[in-house]
From Swiss-Prot:
Gene Ontology biological-process entries: peptide metabolic process; protein processing involved in protein targeting to mitochondrion
Organism: Homo sapiens
Keywords: Acetylation, Calcium, Cobalt, Disease variant, Hydrolase, Iron, Magnesium, Manganese, Metal-binding, Metalloprotease, Mitochondrion, Primary mitochondrial disease, Protease, Transit peptide, Zinc
Gene name for this UniProt entry: MIPEP
Catalytic activity: Release of an N-terminal octapeptide as second stage of processing of some proteins imported into the mitochondrion
Lineage: Eukaryota, Metazoa, Chordata, Craniata, Vertebrata
Name of this chain's protein: Mitochondrial intermediate peptidase
Length: 713
């Protein structure tokens, strides 16, 4: 999944863009002259050996995190933030005194860049750095920059300097499309903060924004909070599956993979038992979002959240979800029948399918039908081989090579972080990817892409190179073998590299819309598209080799893996439709027609099909309501777009350079600087309808990978 700092009006937008040829300055010319640095090494080998960094650079100059001189020590965050805040004051004065024109947008973008360069970096360091002092300093920097952003979002003079530009039709008509869109995005961010309102309403909007931030934080913490039950209330033989604390049993998750039906049932009922405080927090969060949306001129929070997306409005989202649900219903029933059959076989006393059953039994069916034990695949997917595979694919599709570069002393936060230079065959160095791939204590468990610095065209004509981090949680190498990936780890690696390429190739003029800073329902398209490449034998065959024997991964093993993913896939997708629909209803018309739990019950029965379990409140564990409020449908829509792009542009030949260049030009190069549907149209050469999106998702469930793979020899 994708991570971007979101600071409101002048903060980073969640958006992604590709490359542009204009505006390459002296930096790129210099790089072209020395395209391959002597410090670069082949990427595959670099990931299959232990890093030598700490030994090689003992006497080198300490550079600071990501090469930022101030960040050689935690105190440097204070220096960096003070520097950014001083620069901000100067830029605000410039923006307010400059006559309206394109220069206004450039100043706003520089203002956004100076704040994001500290905030985005700090956003990453506060969760990923192993040293508490660095994490705390980064947290403080985030708070400080956040406070400044709140002030800027309520600075009337700053707002009016942009309003003067957008109110002058002649001036607006003279702006190029990208500049105009960036100006409108800045204005949109101002207005959702309520700056256009009178003083009293503006204060109310600010107060609501603060309240929403606090409620979001509280709700998020509550989604992971364990529940406990007195020991004597649980059958003795299942207690050992859970943690004990005195007279209580602690339940901290759903135990979805447990083979014992009773363990899964107990975990489901106890972990999802409603908590009154969490329920009140959710109700207040939804109500506050609705009040804020209405205050700034929207009929619902969903209308506000969907502005500028592919879907554009809640009506289109609901049409998409309802049509998808209709198309899936028969397949989902068949999946539940298949699960019921397996449950009856293993547990004849109780064969009714309950919500805690599908994840476990679909796994059992998969294992029985297809021999896809991960340990059979891991030897073919050493990390070095997978990185080499990515390198081959990117080179053939886009003319891009990945080179390992030795980081300077102090540049990385853990000695096993690798630094990659991303180099185009004719355009030179495009940016840097820091690969934080290995497990360590206190490291967050999610796989993520972080923007550390966005690309933009600087005033001197040079291009500010993008810098990103890819964070995974892979096992470390052992004495006898390099790091070996399961098929799902390999797919995740390709997924996150899709985000990274979006960042590298989104070479926009403006930082505000660079790389992955685009609408949510478009942002996952490049990453999901990479999953299709990761599941194609013609691609896998380029790199999957046994780390000891060098033997290629047999074609039938890839075929089995692909076919196994279709087991109960309709039921899995139906579950996502249910979640997305629930999200839309919660953020739709208020006051809600019922309690959040009653709405959950109705929606589950209509859009999923398995019975609601009394005295449970799954919505109180739905953490995505915070970060993806009214936009949870985005993953399904991004997958539909990626599926269409794959089938129409890459299915015949996954290494088609002309299709790769078109993909870069039409979909990656504009980031948030162009309407997402225009990018989709440019790539597909047609305007897809809701029915097209639904058909793309449903046809993926039918794809006979085995036949296709055998035909592709």
């Amino acid at each position: 999944m994708l991570c971007v700092g979101r600071l409101g009006g002048l903060g980073a937008r969640a958006a992604a863009l590709p490359p542009r040829r204009a505006g390459r300055g002296s930096l790129e010319a210099g790089i072209r002259a020395r395209r391959v640095s002597t410090s670069w090494s082949p990427v595959g080998a670099a990931f299959n050996v232990k890093p030598q960094g700490s030994r090689l650079d003992l006497f080198g100059e300490r550079r600071g995190l990501f090469g930022v001189p101030e960040l050689s020590a935690p105190e440097g965050f204070h220096i960096a933030q003070e520097k950014a805040l001083r620069k901000t004051e100067l830029l605000v004065d410039r923006a307010c005194s400059t006559p309206p024109g394109p220069q206004t947008v450039l100043i706003f973008d520089e203002l956004s860049d100076s704040l994001c360069r500290v905030a985005d970096l700090a956003d990453f360091v506060k969760i990923a750095h192993p040293e508490p002092a660095f994490r705390e300093a980064a947290e403080e920097a985030c708070r400080s920059i956040g406070t400044m952003v709140e002030k800027l979002n309520t600075n009337v003079d700053l707002y009016q300097s942009l309003q003067k530009l957008l109110a002058d039709k002649k001036l607006v008509d003279s702006l190029d499309p990208e500049t105009r869109r960036v100006a409108e995005l800045f204005m949109f961010d101002f207005e959702i903060s309520g700056i256009h309102l009178d003083k009293e309403k503006r204060k109310r909007a600010v107060d609501l924004n603060v309240k929403i931030l606090d409620l979001s934080s509280t709700f998020l913490m509550g989604t992971n909070f364990p529940n406990k039950i007195e020991k004597h209330l649980l059958p003795e033989h299942i207690r050992r599956n859970f943690t004990s604390a005195g007279d209580h049993i602690i339940i901290d998750g759903l135990h979805a993979e447990s083979p014992d039906d009773l363990v899964r049932e107990a975990a489901y009922k106890i972990f999802l038992y409603p908590n009154a405080g969490q329920l009140k927090c959710l109700e207040e969060l939804l109500s506050s979002r609705d009040l804020l949306a209405k205050l700034v001129g929207y009929s619902t929070f969903s209308h506000r959240a969907l502005q500028g997306t592919i879907a554009k409005n809640p009506e289109t989202v609901m049409q998409f979800l309802e049509k998808l649900s209709d198309k899936l219903s028969e397949r989902t029933l068949k999946d539940f029948e298949m699960i019921r059959g397996m449950k009856m076989k293993l547990n004849p006393q109780n064969s009714e399918v309950m919500p805690w059953d599908p994840p476990y039994y679909s796994g059992v069916i998969r294992a029985e039908r297809y021999n896809i034990e991960p340990s059979l695949y891991c030897p073919f997917f050493s990390l070095g081989a997978c990185m080499e595979g990515l390198n081959i694919l990117l080179n053939r599709l886009l003319g891009i090579s990945l080179y390992a570069e030795q980081p300077a002393k102090g540049e990385v936060w853990s000695e096993d972080v690798r630094k990659l230079a991303v180099v185009h065959e004719s355009e030179g160095l495009l940016g840097y990817i820091y690969c934080d791939f290995f497990q360590r204590a206190d490291k967050p468990h999610q796989d993520c892409h972080f923007t550390i610095r966005g690309g933009r065209l600087k005033e001197d004509g040079d291009y500010q190179l993008p810098v990103v981090v890819l964070m995974l949680n892979l096992p470390r190498s052992s004495r006898s073998s390099p790091t070996l990936l399961t098929p799902s780890m390999m797919e995740n690696l390709f997924h996150e590299m899709g985000h990274a390429m979006h960042s590298m190739l989104g070479r926009t003029r403006y930082q505000h819309v660079t790389g992955t800073r685009c609408p949510t329902d478009f942002a996952e398209v490049p990453s999901i598209l990479m999953e299709y490449f990761a599941n194609d034998y013609r691609v896998v065959n380029q790199f999957a080799r046994h780390y000891q024997t060098g033997q290629p991964l047999p074609k039938n093993m890839v075929s089995r893996l692909c076919e196994s993913k279709k087991v109960c896939a309709a039921a899995d997708m139906q579950l996502q439709v249910f979640y997305a629909t629930l999200d839309q209803i919660y953020h739709g018309k208020h006051p809600l027609r019922n309690s959040t739990t009653d709405i959950l019950k109705e929606t589950q029965e209509k859009f999923y099909g398995l019975p609601y379990v009394p005295n449970t409140a799954w919505q109180l564990r739905f953490s995505h309501l915070v970060g993806y409020g009214a936009r949870y449908y985005s993953y399904l829509m991004s997958r539909a777009v990626a599926s269409m792009v794959w089938k129409e542009c890459f299915l015949q030949d996954p290494f088609n350079r002309a299709a790769g260049e078109r993909y870069r030009r039409e979909m990656l190069a504009h980031g948030g600087g162009r309407e997402p549907m225009l990018m989709v149209e440019g790539m597909l050469q047609k305007c897809p309808s809701v029915d097209d999106f639904v058909s793309a998702l449903v046809s993926d469930l039918d794809l006979d990978f085995e036949t296709f793979l055998m035909d592709s020899e």
